[in-house]
């Protein structure tokens, strides 16, 4: 088979019953607690710790698991304003040119190419309104291809959760 080894593994993985039931159970456990010990996952799943390690590593290799880490309250770091910004582009196709410029702005934590009234929707954190104005006026709106922005300030973060994972017991 031609192509990258990763692609070959991904196709092989997809040919399995999408994601095996045990893998789904592992995902459910580690998505709820990324710090859980492999031995505890193994106990809950009724398999060896080595099996858990191998399955997690395989899911990482196949980009089923794309990251792990800790969630830190942005306010503790001095970022008090959470903002969603609708960005309009000259042409939607400019998305690929604009994204690398947005990646240079560390306060931007998410970027989505969207349907609807905006070409893109970005989420960023600013220290305060003055900092937000600097980011908008001196950085985002200066990117070639950006024709306009609309800013929505989040007043409260109400829901934060992981997606549900279904599996057979």
Describe each PLM feature range:
Residues 1-169:
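A compositional/biophysical signature of low hydrophobicity enriched in polar/charged and small residues
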């Amino acid at each position: 088979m031609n192509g990258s080894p990763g692609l070959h593994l991904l196709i092989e993985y997809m040919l399995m019953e999408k994601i095996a039931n045990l893998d789904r159970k592992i995902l459910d456990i580690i998505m709820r607690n990324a710090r859980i010990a492999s031995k505890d996952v193994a106990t809950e799943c009724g398999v060896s710790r080595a099996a858990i390690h191998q399955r997690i590593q395989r899911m990482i290799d196949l980009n089923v698991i794309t990251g792990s880490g800790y969630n830190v309250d942005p306010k503790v770091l001095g970022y008090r304003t959470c903002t969603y910004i609708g960005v309009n582009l000259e042409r939607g196709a400019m998305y690929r040119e604009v994204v690398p410029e947005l990646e240079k702005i560390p306060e931007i934590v998410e970027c989505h190419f969207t349907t609807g009234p905006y070409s893109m929707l970005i989420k960023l954190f600013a220290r305060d309104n003055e900092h937000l104005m600097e980011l908008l006026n001196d950085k985002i709106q200066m990117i070639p291809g950006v024709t306009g922005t609309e800013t929505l300030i989040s007043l409260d973060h109400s829901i934060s959760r992981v997606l549900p994972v279904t599996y057979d017991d």
